[in-house]
Design a protein with these regions (language model features):
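Membrane-interface alpha helices of multi-pass inner-membrane proteins
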Residues: 59, 121, 166-182
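Extracytoplasmic catalytic/substrate-binding loops of multi-pass membrane glycan-assembly enzymes
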Residues: 39-53, 63-77, 83-87
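Transmembrane-helix signature of polytopic, membrane-embedded enzymes
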Residues: 24, 104-127, 145-146
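Short helix- or helix-capping micro-motifs
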Residues: 28-31, 118-126, 174, 178
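Transmembrane signal-anchor helices characteristic of membrane glycosylation enzymes that use polyprenol
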Residues: 20-46
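Loop-to-helix entry region of an early transmembrane alpha helix in multi-pass inner-membrane enzymes
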Residues: 69-73, 83-102, 134, 138
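Short acidic/glycine- and proline-prone juxtamembrane loop motifs at membrane-interface regions
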Residues: 130, 136-144
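Membrane-interface transmembrane helices that cradle and orient dolichyl/undecaprenyl
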Residues: 109-115, 151-166
Length: 191
């Protein structure tokens, strides 16, 4: 008697087995670990911008000079959980790097409905020098990339589904992006 593997149907109608989901999880964890190991192996020191955000995280406020409160708030949270460590400083930057890679890959998949597009976008985004380097620096830029790409993904979903709920998500992601870097305000104006 043949037993079929239990499969899951995603919202896009793509059939995924548990093994494939495990593979995706392995790839995502691999990208995250590679990014962290790059800093460890190359002994990347704390950047002066990161030191500035770390000081701000010790004295939280609604804004800092020309910067929003998101980065210092995230550093404060990670320092509470992970302590005053290198990983405590950079944890959310690594998460934003990973989120940017996944979000751009999902947008590519949604636009083409081809798995190859997802993997190509995943590879190119993960290895993009700007995103890769900024993914290891606790500054506003990687969060700008993350929320920018998340807003684009929400816009693609709106175009395809014509559901007004995506406008709320566009507003939320744009607002969070503005809390990271004011340049984010240009995205809705350009769409």
């Amino acid at each position: 008697m043949l037993l079929a593997k239990r499969s899951l149907i995603s919202s896009d109608g793509i059939q995924m087995t548990k093994n494939r989901n495990l593979f995706y999880l392995f790839v995502i964890v691999g990208i995250f670990v590679t990014r962290v190991l790059f800093d460890v192996v190359n002994q990347i020191e704390v950047h002066f911008d990161e030191a500035q955000y770390w000081v701000w995280s010790q004295n939280l406020s609604l804004s800092y000079l020309s910067k929003g409160p998101l980065v210092p708030a995230l550093i404060a949270i990670s320092n509470k959980v992970l302590g005053q460590t290198y990983l405590g400083l950079k944890f959310f930057s690594y998460v934003a790097y990973l989120g940017t890679v996944i979000t751009i890959s999902l947008a590519a998949f949604k636009l083409t409905n081809r798995k190859e597009s997802f993997y190509i976008a995943l590879s190119l985004t993960a290895l993009s020098p700007a995103i890769f380097i900024l993914g290891g620096i606790a500054s506003t830029d990687i969060f700008l990339f993350f929320f920018w790409s998340l807003t684009i993904l929400c816009y693609v979903c709106f175009i395809q589904e014509r559901d007004e709920k995506w406008f709320y998500f566009i507003g939320i992601t744009t607002g969070l992006g503005i809390l990271a870097k004011l340049t984010m305000v240009l995205l809705p104006l350009s769409i």
